[in-house]
Each structure stands twice: as structure tokens, then as C-alpha cells.
């Protein structure tokens, strides 16, 4: 989607009597339509003692409903030539389908049906606990650098359970989950007033008013329930450096992650976006600062990357969130040499800022990446829905390229100085010499 097309995208909002918020974004340039439900619950909202429950419940939502047996949801979407999925994030869980425009009502029925009454049974619960455990074994326990840095870094940088715990899931706590836990989680967090429905794409057959009528038809009779009060997850920024080492029996080389707190995007949006641009100036492309210094000039690392946001792109989580720099380095390179070089480059950027050409190059990279993502209805829909749920402004997803392009060198310099002036977390991953050195999550 071009900047002109994005600017012309109309956003229509409504709220049903049960509290469900609705966002409709027609796009006549595509033959498909996307339907998504964003629920305002993620890793940070799950109860202590039930680590991984938000992720587990995402799986349960695909196990049938009171109206449809297990796998029926899959068959209905695939028979329409569509795709579907779901994912759990720090502050939300999303579910979506993308289908030909003529299949819009089918997608609305499917999402409403499971939001009304998912099939919560002991069999489904036990089955999905096993599925999640196997997923964790595959992606974390038995994988080199598994959970690096998004699982391993937060407990070094943060102190509170919501921000520090492993949202993917803890085996022992998952195994203790009961059907009553699942029912309580659904009743509390999956209330209509705690969710947002987004419809984006080809709605020409119905028009906006027709889509709203279909939404009312399928979602309007879901009973209203109290909307949970969203707690603040704020906690103080560390006053000094924190450091921790973890063994990894599968890692061929040592690795390190440096974590910093970033500004709150709801109160300091430009400073937050300057940190996103700073990450690109540091590591995106062969000409980026840390690529030139750490990889090519000094040979201190074999790979380096930076990100503004622990799990996703810009504006994918509420405050607090994390700026990360990760690197893999040879065994004979001391971590403090890498840290010193990173600090040198941040100091230079804080003192002088990036050049105009450097900033222009990274702005172009951002614009290209965001436009490529926006070319797909699925990503555009999920971006609109997430920003509407988290910040009340889906428009933020459309404004990102222009707002990033408008950043000035002095704003990037300020972001670099802010990182140097704050406490940070340093996570060191050390290849374990023996499998027994690796802590098993089983």
C-alpha cells in the first residue's frame, strides 16, 4: 500500500451494546478481506502461578466451540481459500482469518462463535498443555540460543512478575492448570468489552453499514461481562548495570544481549520512535555503525542486531518495553570488549548524531520494510487492530513511515545519550560443556 493509499484509508469505529469495539477499514484495491479479534490480555496479564496461561489459552481457542467440533474452524476457513492463525504478545492476543471478500460473513461467524463459547474440556486442556510443552521443547529447550533474548533478558532488566516472567510457559505450572482456571481466564479476559474486532479489505458487497449489521448479527448477542481493570505494569528503571550469565548446551558460540528501557510511547512518542531509528542506525545494513565497528573493523562479533521492542515492531506493546542489542561473538573475545565498543558508538552518536545521509538511508530502509509489510492485508489488519487496542489510534500504523522519516539527527543523538545515561541489563549466554549444565524445563 502506497502512502497515498494509506492516507485515503477510511477508518470506521463502533461499539456494540455488549462493549465489543469494532474497527472497519475498507480497501477497494484488494479482493480479500481480513477479520481479526484482538483481546486485551497477554503474557503480562496472566496470573502468577500460571506462567504461560495466556499462550495456552490461545491454543484452546482453536479446539472447537459449543457450536463447532474440533477442526471445524480450520475446515471452514480452508474451504473458503483462506488462512488463519493466532499469536500471544506481551499485552494482547490476536486471532485472524484472511479470505476472499465473499466469505466475510463466514469469518465473522467463526470468530463470534468461539468468543461466545469455546469448547473448554479436560481433554482439550490436557492435549493443548502437551502441545505447548512440545512447542517449548522445540523452540527453546532443544534449540541453540532458545529464548534468547526475549525470555532470558527480562528477568535481568525487570523486577516484577508481569514484566520479568517467561510468558511462553513453565512446564510445572502448565501441568497444574485446571479446567476451572481456563473457565475463569475466559470469563475474566475474554469479555466482549475487553476485545476489538477489525474488518479490513474488500467489503464492497456489503458496505460499511452492511458490515456493521453482520457484526451485530453474529456478535451482538454475546452476553456482556465486566471488563477487567487493566493494571499498570510500570516499575523503576534500573539505576545501574545488572549482569547475569546462563549456560546453553546447544550454543556453538557465546552470545550477549544488552537491554535498556525505552520511553513510554503514549507520553513520549517522538522519543520512542527515535529509539526505533537508533536501532537501525546501529545495526541495519552493512554500513550501520555496529556492523562496521564490531563485525568488519574490530572482528569482535560474528553477528549483531538491535531492536526497539522486546517481541515485535514499533508500538507493539505498552510501557514498559525494551531496547535490545544482541551479538554472537568468538569464544576468545571478552564480553566487556564488545560492551566497550557498543558504548563508544553510542557516545559518538550522542555527541554528533548520525549524518543526514546516514539518517536518510535508514529512513528509506524503514519505509521499504513498512510498505512491504503493508502490501499484505493480514499484516495491515493486525497492525491497525493492535494500535487501536493498545493506544486507541489505529492511525498510528498508517503514520509510521512519515513519522520515522521526519526524525532529525539531534533526536537520534538524544536517544543514544539516553541509553548511555540509564541502567541496563547484560545477559551473557555461555556454551555449556556438558548437557547436564543446561537447565532443563521438563
Label each residue range with its predicted role.
Residues 133-152, 234-253, 296-307, 352-398, ...:
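Short acidic/His-enriched helical or mixed secondary-structure segments at domain edges of catalytic enzymes
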Amino acid at each position: 500500500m502506497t502512502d497515498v493509499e494509506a492516507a485515503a484509508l477510511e477508518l470506521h469505529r463502533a461499539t456494540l451494546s455488549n462493549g465489543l469495539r469494532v474497527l472497519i477499514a475498507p480497501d477497494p484495491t484488494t479482493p480479500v478481506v481480513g477479520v481479526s479479534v484482538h483481546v486485551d490480555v497477554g503474557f503480562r496479564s496472566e496470573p502468577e502461578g500460571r506462567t504461560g496461561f495466556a499462550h495456552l489459552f490461545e491454543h484452546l481457542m482453536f479446539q472447537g466451540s459449543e457450536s463447532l467440533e474440533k477442526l471445524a474452524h480450520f475446515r471452514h476457513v480452508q474451504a473458503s481459500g483462506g488462512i488463519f492463525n493466532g499469536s500471544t504478545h506481551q499485552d494482547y492476543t490476536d486471532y485472524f482469518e484472511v479470505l476472499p471478500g465473499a466469505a466475510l460473513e463466514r469469518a465473522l461467524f467463526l470468530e463470534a462463535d468461539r468468543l461466545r463459547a469455546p469448547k473448554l474440556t479436560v481433554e482439550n486442556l490436557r492435549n493443548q498443555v502437551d502441545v505447548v510443552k512440545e512447542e517449548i521443547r522445540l523452540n527453546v529447550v532443544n534449540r541453540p540460543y532458545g529464548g534468547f533474548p526475549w525470555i532470558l533478558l527480562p528477568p535481568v532488566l525487570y523486577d516484577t512478575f508481569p514484566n520479568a516472567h517467561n510468558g511462553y510457559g513453565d512446564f510445572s505450572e502448565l501441568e497444574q492448570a485446571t479446567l476451572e482456571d481456563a473457565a475463569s481466564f475466559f470469563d475474566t479476559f475474554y469479555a466482549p468489552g475487553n476485545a476489538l474486532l477489525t474488518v479490513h479489505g474488500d467489503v464492497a458487497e456489503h458496505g460499511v453499514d452492511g458490515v456493521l449489521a453482520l457484526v451485530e448479527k453474529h456478535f451482538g448477542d454475546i452476553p456482556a461481562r465486566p471488563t477487567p481493570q487493566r493494571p499498570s505494569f510500570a516499575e523503576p528503571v534500573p539505576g545501574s548495570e545488572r549482569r547475569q550469565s546462563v549456560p546453553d548446551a546447544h550454543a556453538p558460540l557465546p552470545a550477549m544481549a544488552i537491554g535498556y528501557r525505552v520511553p513510554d510511547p503514549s507520553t513520549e512518542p517522538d522519543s520512542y520512535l527515535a529509539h526505533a531509528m537508533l536501532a537501525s542506525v546501529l545495526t541495519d545494513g552493512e554500513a550501520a555503525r555496529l556492523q562496521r565497528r564490531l563485525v568488519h573493523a574490530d572482528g569482535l562479533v560474528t553477528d549483531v542486531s538491535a531492536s526497539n521492542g522486546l517481541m515485535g515492531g514499533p508500538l507493539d506493546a505498552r510501557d514498559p518495553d525494551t531496547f535490545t542489542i544482541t551479538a554472537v561473538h568468538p569464544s576468545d573475545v571478552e564480553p566487556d570488549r564488545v560492551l566497550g565498543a557498543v558504548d563508544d558508538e553510542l557516545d559518538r552518536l550522542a555527541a554528533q548524531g548520525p549524518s543526514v545521509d546516514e539518517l536518510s538511508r535508514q529512513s528509506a530502509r524503514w519505509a521499504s520494510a513498512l510498505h512491504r509489510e503493508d502490501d499484505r492485508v493480514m499484516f495491515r489488519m493486525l497492525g491497525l487492530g493492535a494500535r487501536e487496542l493498545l493506544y486507541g489510534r489505529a492511525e498510528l500504523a498508517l503514520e509510521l513511515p512519515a513519522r520515522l522519516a521526519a526524525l532529525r539527527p539531534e533526536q537520534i543523538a538524544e536517544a543514544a545519550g539516553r541509553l548511555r545515561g540509564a541502567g541496563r541489563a547484560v545477559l551473557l549466554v555461555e556454551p555449556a560443556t556438558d548437557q547436564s549444565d543446561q537447565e532443563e524445563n521438563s
